[in-house]
């Protein structure tokens, strides 16, 4: 199973070509991978559109994917614990949503495609599975 952070979806919809958007293209084309979308990522991506036509295009594309709920009580507790452990190690994760995404991916053993520095310490210290 694979999921994609908003940092990559935003680049993808903006037409920015990166390693991560190429990985996303491959995941969209390859049905052997279960590509899922987290509810919090859906919100992060869609909230940024000012123009209705762009919002409609992104919403239509994202609606084709199964949406998973990231914010269960177990995931919230795991995200809070991970934040505290990283702070103790001298690392501050800036985004609570990134903590939820990371904790969900760790619990589900779901590979994450991202382009966001907040996920690096989660990978290094907590074994966040990432698609490389």
Regions found by a protein language model. Name each.
Residues 67-113:
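Active-site neighborhoods of divalent-metal-dependent phosphate/nucleic-acid chemistry enzymes
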Residues 5, 37-38, 94-95, 116, ...:
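Histidine- and aromatic-rich ligand-binding microenvironments
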Residues 21, 42, 55, 76-80, ...:
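A general structural signal for well-ordered alpha-helical segments in protein cores
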Residues 52-56, 86-87, 129-132:
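Short, hinge-like loop/turn segments at secondary-structure boundaries
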Residues 9-10, 42-45, 119:
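A generic structural signal for short hydrophobic patches within well-formed alpha-helices
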Residues 1, 102, 106-132:
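Acidic, PIN/NYN-like endoribonuclease modules and their adjacent C-terminal/linker elements
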Residues 1-37, 47-60:
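Short, well-structured N-terminal submotif of metal-dependent ribonuclease cores
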Residues 23, 96, 100, 118:
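Amphipathic alpha-helical recognition patches that constitute DNA-binding helices
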């Amino acid at each position: 199973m694979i999921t994609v952070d908003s940092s990559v979806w935003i680049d993808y919809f903006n037409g920015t070509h990166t390693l991560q958007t190429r990985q996303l293209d491959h995941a969209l084309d390859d049905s052997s991978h279960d590509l899922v979308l987290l509810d919090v990522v859906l919100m992060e991506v869609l909230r940024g559109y000012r123009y209705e036509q762009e919002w409609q295009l992104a919403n239509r594309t994202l609606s084709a994917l199964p949406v998973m709920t990231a914010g269960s009580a177990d995931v919230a507790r795991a995200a809070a614990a991970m934040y505290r452990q990283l702070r103790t190690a001298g690392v501050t994760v800036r985004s609570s949503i990134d903590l939820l995404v990371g904790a969900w991916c760790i619990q589900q053993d779901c590979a994450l495609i991202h382009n966001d520095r907040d996920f690096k310490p989660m990978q290094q210290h907590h074994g966040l599975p990432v698609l490389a």
